[in-house]
Amino acid sequence: MNIKLIAIGKTDNKSLQTLIDDYTKRLSFYIKFDLEIIPDIKNVKNLSESQQKEKEGELILSKLSATDQLILLDENGKTFSSVGFSEELQKKMNSGVKTLVFVIGGPYGFSETIYKKAQGKVSLSLMTFSHQMVRLFFIEQLYRGFTILRNEPYHHQ
C-alpha cells in the first residue's frame, strides 16, 4: 500500500518543515509515502468561501486516481487513539487498498464534491490547529502507527 498526504499551501515555518521532513524520512522505512502540496489559490480576496472550496476541490480531484481511497482530515471526522489508528492502517493494508490518500483542506474546509467523493473522515483532535501543524502531527501519527504495528519502542502505553 502507498500513502499520500495532500495539503493546500506550502509550509512557511522552517522549523515545522524540518520536522515534517524528518518524520517523512522516518516513515519511508515502513511504507511508500508522498506529501503533495497544492499551491495556494491566487486572488482569493475575489472569491467567496464556497468558490474557494470549489476551486481547491477541483485541484484535489486532479491529484486522485480512480482507485485511490480518499480520507479527509476533518474536524467532524472519527477520532482514534494512536493504537486504534495503527489498527485502522492495518485493516486498510489487509483490504488490498493500493493507495490511501489523506487530505488536509484549505482554510474553509472541503467542497461538497470532495465530501461526496471521500470514503471516510478522520479528526486528529477536537481542538483547532494550524493546517501547517496538522501536517506534522499527522505524519508523526502515521510514523507512530507503523512503529506500533512493528512492536517497536517508539510508542509507550
UniProtKB/Swiss-Prot annotation:
GO terms for molecular function: rRNA (pseudouridine-N3-)-methyltransferase activity. The gene is rlmH. Homodimer. GO terms for cellular component: cytoplasm. S-adenosyl-L-methionine binds at residues 73, 105, 124-129. Belongs to the RNA methyltransferase RlmH family. SUPFAM superfamilies: alpha/beta knot (SSF75217). HAMAP family: 23SrRNA_methyltr_H. Specifically methylates the pseudouridine at position 1915 (m3Psi1915) in 23S rRNA. The lineage of its organism: Bacteria, Pseudomonadati, Bacteroidota, Flavobacteriia, Flavobacteriales. The keyword Translocase does not apply. It is found in: Cytoplasm. This is Ribosomal RNA large subunit methyltransferase H. Its EC number is 2.1.1.177. It catalyses: pseudouridine(1915) in 23S rRNA + S-adenosyl-L-methionine = N(3)-methylpseudouridine(1915) in 23S rRNA + S-adenosyl-L-homocysteine + H(+). The keyword RNA-binding does not apply. PANTHER family: METHYLTRANSFERASE, RIBOSOMAL RNA LARGE SUBUNIT METHYLTRANSFERASE H.
